[in-house]
Amino acid sequence: MESDKMEIYESLIRWLGVLQLSAPHENIQQLSDGVALAQALNLIAPEMFSEGWLAKIKVDVGHNWRLKVSNLKKIIEGVYVYYQDILSLNLSEKLRPDAMKIAEKCDGYELGRLLQLILGCAVNCLEKQKYITQIMELEESLQRNIMAALQDIEYVWQGVSPSRNSINATSLDVKTLQEDRDSLAQKCHETNKKMLILIEEKSVLQQEITKLQALIARYENPNLIGDDGTSLGPVQLGSTRYNDLRKVVDSLKDELLQAETARDDLKMKSAMQEKEIADLQVKIDELHTATAEIAQLKDEIDILKEANDKLKMCETQLLTYKKKLEDYNDLKKQIKMLEECSAEYLKQNLQHEEEAKKYSGLKGQVELYKKEIQDLHAKLDSEMSKTVKTEFEYNQLQAKLSAVQREKENLLSERDVLRETCDELKCGQAAEDSESGNTMSKELHSSDVRDRIERLERENKVLREGQGGQTALSQLLDDANQRNEKLRDQLKAANQRVLLLSQHHNEDISSKSDMDIQLKQALELNEQRSSQIDEAQSQMTQLHTKIANLEAALAAKDQELLAADSRYKKCVEKAKEVIKTLDPRAINEALLLEKPSQDGEASSSSATGSGGDASTLTSTGSGRVPMGVQEEQLIATAFYRLGMTCQREAVDSRLALLSGPGQSFLSRQRQPAPRKPMNMPFAKK
């Protein structure tokens, strides 16, 4: 099945080549942009798909699938509107081709469905004969495929017939009335036969009565001649002739009484039959009226059928217009929402521009802060290098100071020892001086002691000389300590300053990062809103185009409604003229009916004038003045009278044909009696 359908769709693509389009249309990829299809629709139905509509189709599409989708959607919507408004056919939404698949994937199945709908437009347009002849001139295989596509479209168009319970009920009533009429016509035929038989019997009895009257006159005449040629003479009492005549008279009186009784019986029968005939005539008249009413009902049924079809068409059109109105209202709401959003976006853009201006001023400050931070970083690096150098010098000085302190402690300990020895020696010398002289002391002291004393003296000299260096070292140490304290103070101040600068730097970095984040967010919001504004503007342009299309469609519908109103007025005037020609007594009724209709039109016009915006909308939507009830009755009566006259003429012509000379006796006997009342000749007596 799918291969057959694809073959049909390929033949439809080949059929497009017959139309001689300017756009490329040789394969599915070339047809997916919708330009060739739009040109084909403009060529097929220029009254619907005008040059203005064709100008809305974008030509240079390329590989932009969004523009392809918009073109295809416009084409599909135009085809559906053409089927609904021009061809009066409602297509289901299941048959709507998918524009996305055609534009994105170049789907041949969906494109074939769209081509099938365009073929339906070509076959049902004003110049359909031209396109049908073009199709007939193609190859047989192409003709078969195109005919299969048309059969599929016709199968889609076929609708289910509506339920007609009321029509079935009326048809059943008509059948029963026809059966009653046939039975009554049969009874009338039988009574007519009986009447003919009685009329023949009556004529026979009248002939016999005339014969008897002639015999009586003959016997009463005195100059009568008998059978043997002799004159019978006058009749006298007691004669045989008188007796014979008397017998004959008595017998004739008896026969006369019998004939009179038979005549009275026949009169009674004929009166009964006349009553039956009158009843049957009344029934026949009733049946004729019933048949006329049935004909009227049939006509009404036909009118109601047409009205029902028109009503369905109007309902479908009304539903489409309602949908279009709802879409129009939704579009209005969307336009209002978009206008509000655009106003909000403009306000936000202005705010963002102001913020951007502020941020541009802040950018200069941030750059200044950056430069200051860079300078502070350079200063901090130099200070750090200085602090490292001072720390290194401080460590060296501490090492030297510790070595000097150790030497000082050693020297102090040795000084103490030497002092003790000096004191001991002084004490020893004083004692030696007191006891003996220097020779004794020299003799008493050993060489070791002398050596030790000499060594101590030398060391004392050295210590005295070293004590002068120690004072210099102590001064140097004090100076180094002062410098160290100064450096410590400077280092503390530098550390504090470094901490403050680092804190300021961190704060500046955090503020800068916050500002950068805010700037990034503001720029992203600005880009998003600019993109949203662009999308809203594109949607606004699309909505403006849709509104323009809808307004053009509404203007066309208004023109159609005005044309329908003019046609309706012409029909009303024709109906009035027909009524005047049929029944001149209805002129006054028509004049009386015109006045309330004019009053109703004036009141409806005043009501529509005072109805405000909603009434103007409804008047533009409908545009039709409502028909008055009396005008409808007037048109209905005129139509029924015309139908009755036409029916009577048809029945009379049929009876004239049936009563022709070339009919048999039985066929003439089966014919119904004429509708005029019968005047019986024997009813006078």
Swiss-Prot record:
Cellular localisation: Cytoplasm, Cytoskeleton; Endosome
One Pfam family here: HOOK
Comp. bias regions, Low complexity: 602-623
CDD domains: HkD_Hook
Membrane-spanning ranges: none
UniProt function note: Involved in endocytic trafficking. Probably acts as a cytoskeletal linker protein that tethers endosome vesicles to the cytoskeleton.
Protein name in the entry: Protein hook
